[in-house]
Amino acid sequence: MRIQFGYVAMSMELANASPSKTMTATQFEKIEDHEAGLRKLERIAKTNLHNCLRLLKHNLAYQISFFRLSSKLVPLVNHPLTEGWKYELAIAEELQAVGEFASEHQMRIDFHPDHFVVLNSEAKEITRRSLQTLLYHYKLLKGMEIDPRHRCVLHVGGKKKGVEAGLEQFIENTASIPKSLLSMIMLENDDKSYTIDDVLYLGEKLAIPVVLDIHHHDVLHRSKSLQETWQRIVATWEDSPLPVKIHLSSPLSGEDDPRHHDYINADRFIAFLHEIGADAVDHLHVMIEAKKKDLALFQLMKDLAEYDEITVVSKSAVEFNP
């Protein structure tokens, strides 16, 4: 099994490359000329996308071909103060540059919209805003000329009336979501409400790929064993153009601490690989969700090189052969 590692949003090594520079609503309101305010937002968004391109070039130098882009590329997007703003036209050139570089170097990029995207809410306004956010990500991907399928990982949402009711509300709500947006979605288990079994119920029923978060699973599960569950997870990816992906982080202290450590516990990851087996999939993409970002990836590669069952094949990929 070949394992490709990626990391999230920004580099700890590359200086002055934040992809999420912003402007507050208060700052925007102080600009007397509304159009001038929008132009300033566009300049910030262009800077963010320029830094995204710098990050992808940094990744190329380290043979990292899997990366999660920041969802905060365009400040004040979908805010009432910027209603009607055609931001995607203003940043078209920058979006295209990012997409061309990613495609040229066969990089997989995706997003993880924030926790305000809730698709199982009974409140129509929350659902409307959630779909607005998905449409924003869709526009970014289309501007990059990247296939939008399975590029946005989401959590199921809240459980105000219980887990079962939350799952059924998700199914009901997705019936009215445009196919173009629904096809973007991957679903991830969380550490508070919905276990991997719950997420699989939706993934199998709605044909949505399921992303296993190992750390979340360790914190919240019905059965900690993944031997039976893993093949069901893999099956949800059968119709996807992308390899199976999982999320990897380590607890700050203790096995069930939901807080993320700066780095990754290699022993826990190796134990997971032995549990699912070397023949589980041919290719596995692993998104590292550690506070030290790319530095955590580099350290994990060093740590994994010490295991007999691991063969390092690039600066960001290994082969697992127990």
From Swiss-Prot:
Encoded by which gene? Answer: uvsE
Enzyme Commission numbers on file: 3.-.-.-
Alphabetized InterPro entries for the sequence: UvdE, UvdE_bac, Xyl_isomerase-like_sf
User: Mind listing the UniProt keywords for this protein, alphabetically?
Assistant: DNA damage, DNA excision, DNA repair, Endonuclease, Hydrolase, Nuclease
Which species is listed as the source?
Halalkalibacterium halodurans (strain ATCC BAA-125 / DSM 18197 / FERM 7344 / JCM 9153 / C-125)
Report the PANTHER family cross-referenced here. UV-DAMAGE ENDONUCLEASE
Provide the family line.
Belongs to the uve1/UvsE family.
**Classification via Gene3D superfamilies:** Divalent-metal-dependent TIM barrel enzymes
Lineage: superkingdom: Bacteria
GO BP terms in the entry: nucleotide-excision repair; pyrimidine dimer repair; response to UV
* Entry function: Component in a DNA repair pathway. Removal of UV LIGHT damaged nucleotides. Recognizes pyrimidine dimers and cleave a phosphodiester bond immediately 5' to the lesion.
GO terms of molecular function: endonuclease activity
Protein name per its UniProtKB record: UV DNA damage endonuclease
HAMAP family found in the cross-reference section: UV_endonuclease
Q: According to the UniProt record, what class of enzyme is this?
A: hydrolase
